[in-house]
């Protein structure tokens, strides 16, 4: 089916690429795609295009990569050029998903139907940069995707629609991300169909209660503090997969922990100091925590690959009584 509603799309990572692909496949014309500039990545630190740019180029879409859209920012000339491009590109609405650049009011005012954001949480919970990670880390039972009419605030716009998704006990940020991306893609296509048909999308202001912020994940958060309860650490490991991973330091070596589950305290676990390995078995490495213990089932040594505990121990033996370092507490 071919649609007439013209969509400028702004986004950067895989989460956004899923939405762009759905919009394109649904038959909406996309006269322009905005995405972040290419960035160095990988071991060779070569410049790499974003997932959104890769999709757009593959399908013959025009792409712009301004470093900023703020005239008062660090790149005023580039911002001015990008804003002029938006003004001169005929379109009806802008869809924004994990773009990574601030959109000033001047930009929000350009599309006739405004700017619609696809956000990976049930707003107003987890506004900000890392909503998927923080929902898992906090132990939330569910999360979701919210479509909102953008304003200049940080994810504060009026809500158009949401989809709720349960968080499974074994979900990682990677697995949950993929379900949320698919849900967001479905939501935005349905919303664009309604916008084209009705000319408007009703939206409800976000409630004042229940606001939380999902701050960007920093590498410094990766270190596991074994003084915390085992269930908290298990959630941290799941939340930090694929980035930055949970890190445990043993004899100066940083070992990444990729899969773990809490186990009840009994016997030697109950009396062992936090960070102490109480068992190193093929089924997993059991480490004492502030309360309970963590059975780690997937590990990675520096320069190595993720391995199941059985394979990891075959090449890098661990033994009961060894102790992971405790990170400094700010």
UniProtKB/Swiss-Prot annotation:
The keyword Oxidoreductase does not apply. GO terms for cellular component: cytosol. It holds the Pfam family Formyl_trans_N. GO terms for molecular function: methionyl-tRNA formyltransferase activity. Gene3D superfamilies: Formyl transferase, C-terminal domain, Formyl transferase, N-terminal domain. It catalyses: L-methionyl-tRNA(fMet) + (6R)-10-formyltetrahydrofolate = N-formyl-L-methionyl-tRNA(fMet) + (6S)-5,6,7,8-tetrahydrofolate + H(+). CDD domains: FMT_core_Met-tRNA-FMT_N, Met_tRNA_FMT_C. The keyword Metal-binding does not apply. (6S)-5,6,7,8-tetrahydrofolate binds at residues 121-124. Its EC number is 2.1.2.9. It is an enzyme of class 2 (transferase). InterPro entries: Fmt, Formyl_trans_C, Formyl_trans_C_sf, Formyl_transf_N, Formyl_transf_N_sf, Formyl_transferase-like_C_sf, GART_AS, Met-tRNA-FMT_C. Keywords: Protein biosynthesis, Transferase. Belongs to the Fmt family. HAMAP family: Formyl_trans. Attaches a formyl group to the free amino group of methionyl-tRNA(fMet). The formyl group appears to play a dual role in the initiator identity of N-formylmethionyl-tRNA by promoting its recognition by IF2 and preventing the misappropriation of this tRNA by the elongation apparatus. PANTHER family: METHIONYL-TRNA FORMYLTRANSFERASE (PTHR11138), METHIONYL-TRNA FORMYLTRANSFERASE, MITOCHONDRIAL (PTHR11138:SF5). This is Methionyl-tRNA formyltransferase. It comes from Burkholderia orbicola (strain MC0-3).
